[in-house]
Amino acid sequence: MAEQRILFVCLGNICRSPAAEGVFLHLIAREGLEDQFVVDSAGTGGWHVGNPADRRMRAAAERRGIHLPSRARQIELADFTSFDRILTMDDDNLRNVKALGRELGNRPGLARVEPMTSYCRQHSATHVPDPYYGGEQGFKDVLDLLEDACGGLLETLLRSP
């Protein structure tokens, strides 16, 4: 399998997308596939650039043995040519990412933009809810959803040529 380049995107890049990045990195490390993937995360907004993931999300992930290594950054046009897939957490993220990508036109070689939940195997959610303004349970629920979706994504990528 050729190296796959995956970018996870949410609003501020401090809760959902760094959690998705961390979960996916955890899964590929467990399978010994680190050399087959480039994984990153970004936000559609730039408010938190340079900051680590939200402390509550980091704590919830650490309880599952998942490390969240990234620092917040904002998605940029170069990401559409640097990554194979861009996975968004909700409809607003999807709409904003697609709008940004339209600036590059419809040329070949651009990243495929998809909702993260399209890879869920057990959950029927249509979006990954933002836990930022909620309590501890919201962070746990997001991690449950992301573990499901990241597992489905990995299965799909390993099956594709």
Where are these regions (language model features)?
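Conserved active-site segments centered on acidic
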Residues: 1-83, 155-161
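Phosphate-binding/catalytic loops
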Residues: 82-85, 91-161
